């Protein structure tokens, strides 16, 4: 029997919410504390993504699932300053909203 996937989906939503709260505190490209906090939550999000069922992920084909999972490796293995803050901000600004919409849809569908 496989583990329930819903807690991982909730971890993703929680990480997205935290990232938005971090952004509300200032520009993460200019503040290393905010930047580090955002990176940590992106790592959490990217670690939870592969634990979602593939059949659920196929319902959101526009989400780059493999890239999200791969982003975790970049975050973990390039932690010594090789990650461009502007790229991170762009990922947050352009990709978290569709991901959140997809995860919410997965959870809503599961409750029906």
Task: Name the predicted role of every residue range.
Residues 1-112:
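Solvent-exposed interaction patches of small proteins and small membrane subunits
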